[in-house]
Amino acid sequence: MNCAPPRQLFTFGTYVAVEAVEADLPAIAAFYAESPEYLRMVEAREPAPQDALEFLSAVPPPELSYRDHYALLLRDACSRIDGLMMVATDLPATGVWHLSLMMVATRLHGRGLAQAAYGAYEAWARASGACWLRLGVVEQNVRARRFWQRQGYVEIRRREGVAMGDCLSTVLVMWKPAANASLGEYLAAAPR
């Protein structure tokens, strides 16, 4: 678990994206409690105290290679957590940046924070050498699917029967180029 001081990775407007550290656990738990809709929709459950620790300690599955993994907090000018992101680089292949979670505080839905945060994330990924961007969106999360389509992502695969809490879901794997790299090149590099 990361106990070092938080490291700033990118900024946007009055926000900063920092790596989560152990001292952030109570604030992360409060964020989940104040914004339960995602867990209700995707896992059919209420937030629980262990969600904060799971966010902080989560890593990609052992069968997938990756270079770096970040549990990011989107903090406002007063250091309040208004969003969470999980990012893995070079997953499942060199040049692929995988965004496994992006969650914005419910009270800020519809106010442009997700758009601004995503734009800053994409700029950071591109500046850091990403060739392709990918993510998975749970099929029943229609609002998220539409958001990602507006960001230029296209569905390239469906993974059925993915365990999300106690639920089995269909996950839409979505992709977009971050550099002059084609879908064919991506599929050759990352066949999963």
Language-model features, listed with the residues they occupy:
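Acetyl-CoA-dependent GNAT
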Residues: 2-15, 19-25, 30-109, 115-120, ...
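Residues at or immediately flanking beta-strands
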Residues: 71, 132-134
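C-terminal "cap" of GNAT-fold acetyltransferases
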Residues: 12, 97, 131, 138-145, ...
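Catalytic cores of transferase enzymes with a strong primary signal for eukaryotic protein kinases
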Residues: 31, 35-40, 64-66, 134, ...
